[in-house]
Amino acid sequence: IDIRGIMRAMAENIKTMSFSQGASTLTQQVLKNEVLEREKSLSRKIKEQYLAVSLENALKKQLGSKDAAKKYILELYLNTIPLHHGLRGVEAAAQYYYGKHASELTLAEAASIAGITKTPSLYAPDVNQEASKERQMTVLKKMLDLNMITQAEYDEAAAEDIYAHLVCKETAEEESNAKHNWFVEAAVQQIKADLMEKKNMTAAQASNMIYSGGLQIHTTMDASMQETAEAAMKNDNMFPAGDGKMDVTYLISVLDTQNPDESSNQSHYEKKTTVTSQAEADAFVASVKEELLDETHTLVLDKLTVSKSLQAAMVIMDQSNGEVKAIVGGRGEKPGDSVFNRATQALRQQGSTMKPLAAYAPAIDTGLLMPGSIIIDEPVTYGGWSPKNWDGKYIGPTTVRQGIWHSMNVLAVKTFMMVGADTAYQYLLDFGFTTIDERDKAATTALGGLTQGVSVLEQTAAYATIANGGTYYEPMFYSVVYDHDGNVLLDNSEQETHRVLKETTAFLLTDMMRDVITKGTGTKAAISGMNVAGKTGTTNDTVDLTFYGYTPYYTAGIWMGYDSQKEIINANNAHLRIWSSVMSQIHYDKGLKNKEFEKPDGLTTRSICSASGMTPSSLCNSDYYGYGVTSDYVTTDFKGGTGGGTCTMHKSYTICSETGKLAGATCPTMNVVLAVNSDGTIKGKPSKVPEGKLDINISATCD
């Protein structure tokens, strides 16, 4: 360990009450690069010292000598040292900057790479040629002083114009035109997490393995599906006009030239604003530079991103195996690498798309309700909170089926409370949600009112569970990863699964959510000639728009909204149209034929009154406006009644055959059977009475 250096750093830290002074030997630098986090603290420095001693002692014992241990440490250092642009190790740097192997570098080129290490963002040869040349000459002079090179070699290297044959600028241009797409970045993040969890690697080790380890990665991406999804997200015609504003994010790194310490002489800033033109964005950048830059604070790197304010994200999965086939984390062109992915990183409220998961799935799965079961739609209050239906109406006895396709809030909340918060919460955990907590054991969860929110990816996976007959697969971006020798490093091909719902429950939910598409709130998500089931969601003040749906082949979820969480103006079901467009194209491209959702054993049908959902009375088939007896699914082991008894909504009324009012003493009369809601309105009465029918009004009596 560099004892003198550590003592110098400690003295400086005590004097300044900070821990920014670095004093690392190669061993400690390797540990910093490979194992330890970047936090600057005394505890981390102590860890470095302890691990450095332990590592050197272990290597001396294993390799037989201190000299062999030092050579091994040097090799590790040269293979892991950061050399700007995300490069790790001298081989990667040689390839990037000069297009050759490290062993093929000239002395001048090698010295320029060696010089990068002090402050990579300043001394990289493609960043600042003047500073890079100065550093290169420092390295060459030190080598000459140590008699590692001759004067002639020094003179030749000093005269060589290494900048004339840099290849990195062309490489950078190619890379900027071929940024990692949304899928590749999501796959890298999952692989990194799995390396840390399953191989006990640190974050630094996992990153080095991915980018410098020569891995062969097999992803689950379907290229044509990814292209289709990205194309839709880039098509401005698919989106509402909005307010014409654009979000600006300006990232800037500033070098303090008066601070010689390489570990703390840079500051990084993220500045944001909203503009209506590129000129405004450029003016904003100029103002930030004027604020941050001066004679002693120089620009290292900066990056400007201008994006449409109204954003969207989409995920497409194969529900049969959990494979993610396509993912898009934002609208328009992807602004760069390692950018915010709204499909995996944004936690948003999901609105009514949470109703089937938090309320109806547990209720049906535990045998409390069936599609034809009746719940009274009426004003209710829970703990001071009174949920209201989106249309402001209450219609009395209503079936679960109608509650889903008409997206009725009161029915969902009543169902959630019937199930119990603890049970509902456990089902959500089983559906794979990782960002919910005990605070979500609340009635608001039935309507998607979560403490933190959930990601589009996890919500899509939950719907894929229903589409897959109730069996959950964790979303998977890769199938297998091989190391540089061809050995299996990570294997996702046989993923563990667990059952969340009975097959019968999954089918009943699917059958009810088909009605969302055929006659409910999701008609704009229909796919011509293909069965679709799904659920729409809208949060308060139209801040978030969501839809999660599936065919017998694929499950897809879409979110639309502003990062700033403001109201979406004139949305006009744009998210549903995008979903339908993307999924229609995918099924067409693959030549997929329509087929039914697979119906499991254990289901039968039961006759019910189509108005009340109860067991039909003798009057039900005589409804004046057409409500009659229908049937709906129940499980064969269902013990309860779908409506708690025989229909009480249908009653016979004597009316005036001329006015449609209740008959007076002298009126010509006729008897009609009507289903009457709890508020006295007639259920099923059309706004425009058909020809040949009376406009019946039972709230008035004919004179």
Question: What would you call each of these model-derived segments?
Answer:
Residues 188-199, 205, 310-349, 361, ...:
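Active-site beta-strand/loop architecture of penicillin-binding DD-peptidases
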Residues 92-96, 121-125, 154, 160, ...:
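Short pre-catalytic segments that frame enzyme active sites
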Residues 162, 169-176, 433-489, 494, ...:
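Active-site-proximal helix/loop microenvironment
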Residues 1, 74-78, 109-118, 135-139, ...:
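Active-site-proximal alpha-helical segments within enzyme catalytic domains
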Residues 21, 25-29, 41-45, 101, ...:
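Extracytoplasmic/periplasmic proteins that interact with beta-lactams or build/remodel peptidoglycan
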Residues 13-37, 170-178, 368-424, 484-515:
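Conserved catalytic neighborhood of penicillin-recognizing serine enzymes
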Residues 1-151, 155, 204-206, 331-333, ...:
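Peptidoglycan glycan-strand catalytic modules in the bacterial/periplasmic cell-wall system
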Residues 256-263, 532-533, 537-703:
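Soluble, non-transmembrane domains of envelope/secretory-pathway proteins that act on or interact
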